[in-house]
């Protein structure tokens, strides 16, 4: 449904060297579902996307990562491309941005080499993910478990291995965000029905 994610704001964190299709495919899927998508980067202007080893399009950056926090968004997407996350993992603001999403238990989706940022943010302890196969040792050294699957979901963390996985990745990404919205709505309904200041139901209200 076009309005499935209406009002949700999703950050895409990327820089030069991002694999173009890993940026555009989930970007378009989320837009079609009604989400607002924002390209966050380590610099202003434009970034250079890649089609494997060839230059792709130049993509406009919406906001610098140093000027925003995870609280400004509902979810985060980490596309791959080797140079992209390898550069971002050396940027303290980018790493902090990723860590904040994980600490706030917000949906995070990463594909291919994107999970390198999760490794750098020390956000994989006790988590099970997939990625480009060469990241397996990095994931395990960071305290995570690695599996070879098209799509892996661990709570609100979604990961996939490569561009060929994008169709399944995009479907699951929209589902993950929709489920998170439903969960928040339920929490809000409970809070409205049973405010924290209300006495407990039953014959005795504890003080």
Model-identified regions with their sequence ranges:
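Extended, subdomain-level signal for the structured scaffold at the beginning of enzyme domains
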Residues: 1-104, 108, 116-128, 136-181
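Catalytic nucleophile serine of serine hydrolases
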Residues: 112
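Active-site-adjacent substrate-recognition loops and nearby beta-strands
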Residues: 132
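Intrinsic, low-complexity terminal and presequence regions
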Residues: 181-207
């Amino acid at each position: 449904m076009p309005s499935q994610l209406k009002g949700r704001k999703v950050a895409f964190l990327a820089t030069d060297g991002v694999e173009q299709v890993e940026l555009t495919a989930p970007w378009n899927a989320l837009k079609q579902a009604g989400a607002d998508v924002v390209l966050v980067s380590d610099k202003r202007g434009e970034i250079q996307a890649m089609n494997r080893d060839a230059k792709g399009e130049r993509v406009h950056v919406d906001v610098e990562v140093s000027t925003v926090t995870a609280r400004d968004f509902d979810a985060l997407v980490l596309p791959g491309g080797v140079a992209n996350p390898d550069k971002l993992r050396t940027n303290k603001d980018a790493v902090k941005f990723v860590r904040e999403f994980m600490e706030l238990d917000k949906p995070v989706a990463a594909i291919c080499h994107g999970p390198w940022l999760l490794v750098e943010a020390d956000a994989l302890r006790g988590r099970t993910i997939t990625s480009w196969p060469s990241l397996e040792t990095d994931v395990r050294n960071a305290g995570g478990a690695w599996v070879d699957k098209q799509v892996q979901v661990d709570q609100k963390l979604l990961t996939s291995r490569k561009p060929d996985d994008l169709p399944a990745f995009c479907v699951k990404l929209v589902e993950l965000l929709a489920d998170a919205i439903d969960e928040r709505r339920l929490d809000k309904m409970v809070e409205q029905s049973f405010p924290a200041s209300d006495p407990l139901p039953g014959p005795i209200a504890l003080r």
